């Protein structure tokens, strides 16, 4: 377990720093430029990178996982140094923070699937694996919450150079935690990437066929595309909303992220603790949680229109908390239903196909957020998208 703890703590600092740096970058870039196009571009790159995580999965199967983890974290350190060099050499804080965040997004193509697969390659025995996974889950939740706090420190200084220096210290700490880690892992198979891509494509097509034949699953696909588009469009508008509408509260963007994260954790906790013998968390009630997600987004737009800034701030933060809860519960109910409604040997293919389809709307949302911001005010856009989400959920009731 000693090796596992080293990896978990390293991942904790890496995830914490990466999340805080992204939040700070979005806030800082919009505050300086007041141009939504920069936020859209960063969001687009991040979302496109997510679509290619299967490549990172193949690479993590082909290369020694511990060695690959050291390499990726080491590149993060060098990348942050590069950002500092750009900042001081060209005196361009926007370029320096954008380059750093973009390269980190590309690194996540490998890092995300690698951290998911490295634990089973090291632990021995079912009990150790369960214990290790519980530690990983706790560390991930804690880093997600604390990243909002760390980004608040970055925002307090409001300086890219200071933000990158603090990030560099934490990335170096993340690297030092694994630098002496033995590269010995369970023997893996030599992976032919071309063969795996072909197999993955075939699995995706098989998953698609099952989805088309299963009404319970297929009915939600178009609805999810609409809701994902609306959510990501709204989320990418949050730096703009925080700065343009709630300029009196410097830490509004951090509060929004923290509220959403805490809501997601509370939703998962509620299902885990209360689902036995309760009729609230059943597949039958999934449409209501979907409808409530749209309502929460609508309320965010509504509270943003209030004349009282304090009332608006409290309302928006609470609405994001509510959205996090409803989204978390809804996701658990839906994917649990999927797992129960398809043969066990097809679950992976079906869920993989569903996640791929759902994510197709994300880059479109990133592209759309900038032109939408020129049409009308941000609160009106958010209110309208919340209304669309609520209307999109109606067919699921039937």
Where are these regions (language model features)?
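Juxtamembrane intracellular "pre-TM" segments in multi-pass secondary transporters
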Residues: 1-4, 184-222
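Substrate-agnostic recognition of the 12-TM MFS/MFS-like secondary transporter fold
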Residues: 6-22, 45-58, 64-77, 96-155, ...
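The feature captures the transmembrane alpha-helix scaffold of multi-pass secondary transporters
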Residues: 8, 36, 40, 94-102, ...
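Extracellular/periplasmic helix-loop-helix junction of adjacent transmembrane segments
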Residues: 24-49
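Transmembrane alpha-helix termini and helix-breaking/packing motifs in multi-pass membrane transporters
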Residues: 26-32, 84, 88-89, 146-166, ...
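C-terminal transmembrane bundle of multi-pass solute transporters/carriers
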Residues: 66, 72-75, 82, 243-398
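A single, central transmembrane helix in multi-pass transporters
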Residues: 160-162, 208-268
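Helix-loop junctions on the cytosolic side of multi-pass membrane transporters
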Residues: 164, 168-195, 397-398
């Amino acid at each position: 377990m000693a090796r596992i703890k080293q990896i978990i703590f390293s991942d904790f600092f890496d995830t914490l720093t990466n999340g805080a740096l992204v939040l700070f970058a979005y806030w800082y870039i919009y505050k300086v430029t007041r141009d939504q196009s920069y936020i859209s571009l960063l969001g687009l790159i991040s979302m496109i990178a997510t679509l290619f995580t299967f490549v990172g999965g193949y690479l993590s199967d082909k290369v020694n996982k511990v060695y690959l983890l050291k390499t990726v974290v080491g590149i993060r350190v060098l990348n942050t140094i590069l950002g500092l060099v750009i900042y001081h050499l060209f005196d361009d804080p926007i370029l320096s923070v954008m380059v750093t965040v973009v390269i980190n997004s590309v690194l996540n193509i490998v890092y995300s699937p690698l951290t998911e697969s490295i634990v089973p390659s090291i632990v021995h025995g079912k009990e150790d694996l369960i214990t290790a996974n519980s530690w990983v889950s706790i560390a991930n939740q804690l880093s997600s919450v604390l990243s909002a706090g760390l980004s608040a420190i970055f925002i307090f200084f409001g300086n890219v150079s200071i933000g990158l220096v603090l990030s560099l210290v934490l990335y170096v700490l993340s690297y030092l935690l694994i630098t002496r880690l033995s590269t010995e892992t369970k023997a893996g198979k030599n992976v032919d990437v071309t063969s795996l891509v072909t197999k993955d494509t075939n699995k995706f097509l098989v998953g698609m066929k099952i989805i088309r034949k299963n009404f319970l699953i297929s009915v939600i696909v178009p609805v999810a595309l609409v809701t994902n588009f609306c959510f990501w469009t709204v989320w990418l508008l949050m730096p703009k909303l925080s700065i343009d509408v709630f300029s009196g509260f410097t830490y509004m963007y951090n509060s929004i992220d923290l509220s959403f994260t805490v809501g997601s954790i509370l939703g998962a906790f509620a299902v885990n603790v209360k689902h036995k013998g309760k009729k609230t968390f059943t597949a039958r009630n999934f449409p209501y949680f979907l409808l409530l997600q749209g309502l929460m987004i609508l309320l965010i737009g509504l509270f943003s229109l209030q004349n009282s800034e304090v009332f608006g701030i409290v309302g928006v933060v609470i609405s994001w908390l509510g959205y996090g809860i409803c989204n978390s519960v809804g996701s658990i109910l839906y994917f649990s239903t999927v797992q129960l409604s398809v043969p066990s040997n097809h679950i992976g293919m079906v869920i993989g196909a569903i996640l791929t389809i759902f994510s197709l709307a994300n880059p479109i949302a990133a592209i759309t957020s900038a032109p939408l911001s020129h049409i009308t005010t941000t609160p009106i856009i958010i209110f309208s998208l919340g209304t669309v989400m609520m209307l999109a959920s109606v067919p699921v009731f039937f």
